[in-house]
Regions:
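N-terminal secretory signal peptides that target proteins for export/translocation
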Residues: 1-4
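Short, non-ligating residues that shape and space the ligands of small metal-coordination modules
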Residues: 50-51
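The canonical Cys-X-X-Cys-His
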Residues: 33, 37-47, 101, 131, ...
Length: 141
């Protein structure tokens, strides 16, 4: 399946809104989320999400242990907060500049434009949603 139909399917399944989760992520969405996570998040957060990626040592601040994100928030992954951190576009400009984590919303938008996609914002939301769904699978009890 090409990336465009997949992004449309994922975005439609999520209702195109932040914080709206599907009852269960699709296998396809989890695969996309895993691919995105391993390519974009694992260099700092590590393949298992413990904050021990190969680039972690070169950062001023150690990356968060993503496996305990839900535990640190009362046992439930704070989806709106996680979405905002991953997307990053709604954060104050100074906050964006001070953080080591890329603003993935901008990065995905740039990627969509480079691919000459017509569905730029649905593509961005679908990618972030997929990463968020995969992040749920990394949580420890």
């Amino acid at each position: 399946m090409s990336a465009r139909p997949l992004s449309v399917v994922i975005a439609a399944a999520l209702g195109l809104s932040v914080g709206v989760a599907t009852a269960a992520a699709t296998k396809e969405q989890l695969q996309v989320g895993q691919q995105e996570y391993l390519a974009k998040c694992a260099p700092c957060h590590g393949p298992s999400g413990k904050g021990d990626g190969p680039q972690a040592a070169s950062l001023k601040q150690k990356p968060s242990d993503l496996t305990t994100y839900a535990r640190r928030n009362g046992g439930k992954l704070p989806e709106k907060q996680a979405w905002a951190l991953i997307d990053g576009r709604q954060l104050d400009d100074r906050v964006q500049q001070d953080r080591a984590m890329p603003v993935w919303g901008h990065m995905y938008k740039t990627q969509a434009r480079a691919d000459e996609r017509a569905d730029i914002e649905p593509y961005v939301r679908a990618r972030i949603a997929a990463v968020l769904e995969y992040l749920k699978t990394l949580q420890v009890k």
